[in-house]
């Protein structure tokens, strides 16, 4: 499963691009350069990662209200666990489920079923919130989960999308009840 070996996949993509250039008559480029480009892209991606604005506050408010919370994420165990720590998420969730630690991930049904079972909730009691239409909307909806798509950049659904999220938000704070004054 390539999403558990992203660095290797990036090297292969760069090497493939170099091969295409060479086949088109361009001077061959070194594999060392492919490795360095792949490494730099990985570092760049890491630098660009962020917690959605308002996420910590919203998650903390849900937890304070007694909502059971699971973080379900794909990827290799080491890098994902490092992100959980980097973004101070561990204490905020009742269950953290990383694909590389469990051997399955989204959009596999058992990823959602395992999280629900661990929390002791049913599909009708569950909300799935995320920015990936396939993994956090389509697949959960098949199980009867209320699927919320977070459109953090405000781009809206792709024009050709047939996906219909149960709700679209720009920030997790939109899910909190309004403050009473």
What kind of feature is each model-predicted range?
Residues 35-39, 52, 130:
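Short C-terminal alpha-helical element
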Residues 32, 56, 60-63, 67-181:
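Asp-based, Mg2+/Mn2+-dependent phosphohydrolase catalytic module
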Residues 1-40:
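A metal-dependent, Asp-based hydrolase signature
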Residues 8, 49-53, 105-106:
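Conserved phosphate-coordination/catalytic loops
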Residues 25, 48-49:
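Short helix-to-loop capping/linker segments positioned immediately adjacent to catalytic or ligand/cofactor-binding
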Residues 41-48:
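Surface-exposed cleft-lining segments at the edges of enzyme active sites
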């Amino acid at each position: 499963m390539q999403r558990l070996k992203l660095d290797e996949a990036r090297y292969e993509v760069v090497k493939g691009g170099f091969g295409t250039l060479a086949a088109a008559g361009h001077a061959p480029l070194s594999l060392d350069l492919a490795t360095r480009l792949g490494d730099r892209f990985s570092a760049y991606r890491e630098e660009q990662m962020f917690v959605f604005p308002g996420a910590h506050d919203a998650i903390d408010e849900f937890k304070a209200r007694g909502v059971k919370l699971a973080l379900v994420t794909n990827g290799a165990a080491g890098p994902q666990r490092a992100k959980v720590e980097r973004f101070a998420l561990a204490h905020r969730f009742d269950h953290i489920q990383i694909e590389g630690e469990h051997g399955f991930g989204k959009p596999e049904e058992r990823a959602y079923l395992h999280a629900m079972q661990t929390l002791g909730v049913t599909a009708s009691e569950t909300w799935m919130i995320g920015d990936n239409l396939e993994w956090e909307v389509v697949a959960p909806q098949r199980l009867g989960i209320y699927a919320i798509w977070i459109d953090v950049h405000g781009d809206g659904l792709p024009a050709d999308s047939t996906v219909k999220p149960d709700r679209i938000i720009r920030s997790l704070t939109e899910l909190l009840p309004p403050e009473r004054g």
